[in-house]
Amino acid sequence: MKIKQVQSIIDQNAPLISNLANLSRVLMDLVEGTFWCGFYLVDEENNLYLGPYQGSLACTHIKYGHGVCGKSLELKKSLIVPDVHKFPGHIACSSLSNSEIVVPIIKDNKVIGVIDLDSTKFDNYTEDDKAFLEEVANIIANL
């Protein structure tokens, strides 16, 4: 059901950035306990830069392999972090964040960006959230 809501707001004729802007709002509403939801996009140096998001101010640049987002980019895999304070090298963009999930957006075997969600609750994100967000990432990769 949630994936149908995502599909319903995708505009195949709109630029990627426009779709990501709307998706950041929808995902914030659909994934319970989320206080920050956004996208980081990969630049030509294989680092991440801030894309559309909902929530408080965010880090604008994340280096490859750094923090949860950079590690997801490096490993090309989704990461669920139940307690960000225990994650080696965590980048604290907000002191409110206690748990995080990051899902890479992979197109033609290359990560083009990541979906990043943060919660004030510890252990907020589940395997179901991961599966849902991986479906969303697949939709984005095919835009």
Identify the role of each PLM range.
Residues 36, 102, 114:
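Short hydrophobic/aromatic beta-strand element in the GNAT-like acyltransferase core
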Residues 31, 92-97:
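Short loop/turn motifs at secondary-structure junctions and domain boundaries
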Residues 99-106:
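A short, aliphatic-rich beta-strand micro-motif
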Residues 106-119:
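Sensory-domain boundary capping and coupling elements
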Residues 1-53, 143:
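Intrinsically disordered, low-complexity terminal regulatory regions
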Residues 7-9, 119-143:
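Juxtadomain coupling helices with adjacent low-complexity linkers
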Residues 42-92:
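Regulatory sensory and allosteric helical modules in signal-transduction proteins
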